[in-house]
């Protein structure tokens, strides 16, 4: 016996059999030990051969059990194992059989045949008793081998290669496991057209991720099964190659190539009956490539060129360009079929086709309006992915979310159960009390508990009944789906009696039962049963960060009160607030180009008048969040080269992988206000980047990705022309100096930049009467800082006037007021809090003195008998 002549699998089995013999206490190594490990193998090649040869694996196991128990056992001896005479003959016969068949190595099936043929071995009797004959085994082996010989030590891994390394899509289609494919007729027709060619009949589906390339292959499988293909493709098998399984576990050099050759050999032997589908086709290029080895694509090329291999590939545009086009010899063997993203209307049709599958899986209903919302909202708000994939994901997640709520206890019932638990704890505590009040309270608790437990039982029964009803509807849908699949199979097989029973008996009956189950509407139902546009919008909100009420709240009321809302934060700039509100209303009413940003504005005015504050207020109004804003200080972009910081460095430069400040912020959160502060400080070339943002709502970053700006509000602030606005009289209209200001602006910015901005808004200097309102806003912010300490500030009218007068400076706007409040209010307050004069929870009255403010705590450690000290500290 030469162990080198045996395959790795057989060597492994011999080793396992020896270990098994020793652990069983046997000193003789017999054929029974070998058969035992062969039959118990996880991959089951021997067991599969026995079954295919007409044998009974269970009988083989029972016979082996009996034979092994009869073998002599030795305990406490040495670990010496002796080869029995029958086993030596089995090995010799196996080598002889392999040699006759032209094999270079002894394989599992040759060893199994030898175990069945060698009369001196007990295994021959066991296999014979189980119905296995050497003749039947040889027939099955020849069927499996398909004329191939075992030329390598890993020969067994190449048997039934297609079954191991590919998935039969046509079989899945027959079993009804594939989702229906709606539309895409043109692409499927083009694919069939290429497949019907004589040579180079290999289409490759090229399109963006998520547009439905794999679905087209599944659509082709469904058409083949339904016979909806030309004669040349009738009864073909479409097999999806699993590159992961093909590469996994290929440890030794040349093993991967062997597996792939085995797959190709099976496809070629099928004489054109098998079409291979390779998803992510770019993985072929370089797959299995090691020193001196060929990669998968080179192994495929000859068969592809001769037309022996029918192949459908699928890959994305990016990967096709990066991997396949570089290999011109591979690219020319494939015929590209471009798959475009479907329109919103097509996506709605696709969702309607898939609706039943998702309803059946999640056991909830999906309304048609939810499908329309999923298609339209995903198209509008999820810009970095493609239809129909993103819309399908939305429906899937919305249904999953609803199902989670259905399975959880309803809020109403949960509150009652928590109250019952609370009352039970209180009842146990009161039972030990003897006073009259406690007894009276105990009686009231018993009464309330009785009522609540009754209500809880009713609600629980109602909840369970509703869940059961939902489950019944889902069960009927599943039965209906199975009946439809059975009808399709019966029609294909020509079983017309069965088809008639299903079509005119079972299916109409199930449809009626389902309609009855769904028509029973529950008034005041505890459970939501249907996915609505609201659920879809909530998922969008989770994905993108847009508050859901921004889309679903009646926006008319919200937009009509926009001036009032923003006016609470921005004082004295009525014209600016009105102008920006009108622009946003125009955009929301759909009267503005949807391919441009929501609005783009330049705010011009002196310092401290509220330009940046208006931007923050706008972000808070539109997105309910002050931080939904990217602030870019243009003073940092004074050099020409600094533009790369906005959009990312070009290839070959340091920082290429990092992306740009502007583009990355908008890619991560596409819905926000973008503030370019002090734009006149930036280099003029920086504005060239903004031209396409303002015009088309898009910008290409350093890595070639298109970033969508259609849902942003772009605001630029500047001090240009501020001298004209500062010198304006308190009651003068800003429009009187607009021409002068615009003259300065035009001298600084190019016409094509200014021409793309929606509106240039002028801010006038703050008036004296505006200062009181600004004092209140600033004091509210200070009050917020003190809220942790529960200290309340009460600012008297005289103190407000005092602060407004002291902080008013027409040239510098509201900023001097902030400094005055810091010096006259915050500093004394901080000192008093640290001294312990003002305690947590105090009310502090602030009044005006002659040259300072006075602080009087109403409650706390500060003594009313020490007014002199209070004034000193002020």
UniProtKB/Swiss-Prot annotation:
Gene3D superfamilies: 1.10.8.60, Clp, N-terminal domain, P-loop containing nucleotide triphosphate hydrolases. Induction: By heat and acid shock. Its main location: cytoplasm. It is found in: Cytoplasm. Residues 766-874 are annotated as: C-terminal. Residues 160-341 are annotated as: NBD1. Residues 3-147 form the Clp R domain. GO terms for biological process: cellular response to heat; protein refolding. The keyword RNA-binding does not apply. Residues 83-147 are annotated as: Repeat 2. ATP 2 binds at residues 605-612. Pfam families: AAA (PF00004), AAA_2 (PF07724), AAA_lid_9 (PF17871), Clp_N (PF02861), ClpB_D2-small (PF10431). Residues 342-545 are annotated as: Linker. CDD domains: AAA, RecA-like_ClpB_Hsp104-like. Belongs to the ClpA/ClpB family. Homohexamer. The oligomerization is ATP-dependent. PANTHER family: ATP-DEPENDENT CLP PROTEASE, HEAT SHOCK PROTEIN 104. This is Chaperone protein ClpB. It comes from Brucella suis biovar 1 (strain 1330).
